[in-house]
């Protein structure tokens, strides 16, 4: 009985969250799935078509932005930090929460990416098209298209597809003008 009540409340919350929150995003494509609770400021996030954010995803620091391309998914418990603290002479560390002199930027996740559960995307992270980030990885830099990365810091451990498979995959998902070429 208690379990049924829990699922009932969860389903009501989820449907409310999915129908009311998308309008608050900087940009929100169609067929976007938001599985709350999410700890984000939607005005700092752009979501492409057919994207998914799983529960307990959080974005720390106001001022930075997150762009998520179409067909991408962010797993449960991911943390996105689009800022970098800059040490300031004369400012004690305990006041760093004031974010004086912080650098912020946009973290970009290209199309068709999968960010594994519990991963961290830090300042200067940029995820190339089709990349897969293993669970609990810490990304601190550019990840090339169709790379599979894992670890802390995230390192390339494989490629998602062969070049021929990438070209076939691109032909299925994208119109000719959006496809990657063999050289890319």
Predicted regions and their residues:
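Short amphipathic alpha-helical surface patches that serve as generic macromolecular interface elements
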Residues: 114-116, 130-136
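Flexible, glycine/small-residue-enriched loop-and-beta-strand segment within the central core
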Residues: 38-47, 52-126, 152, 160-161
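Terminal amphipathic alpha-helical/low-complexity segments used for targeting or macromolecular assembly
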Residues: 1-24, 29-30, 71, 78, ...
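Glycine-centered loop/turn positions within well-structured domains
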Residues: 66, 137, 145-147, 155
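A generic "structured core" feature
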Residues: 40-41, 79, 132, 138, ...
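Short beta-to-alpha loop/turn elements within the nucleotide-binding domains of ABC transporters
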Residues: 125, 136-137, 143, 152
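Conserved short histidine dyad/triad with adjacent acidic residue
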Residues: 34
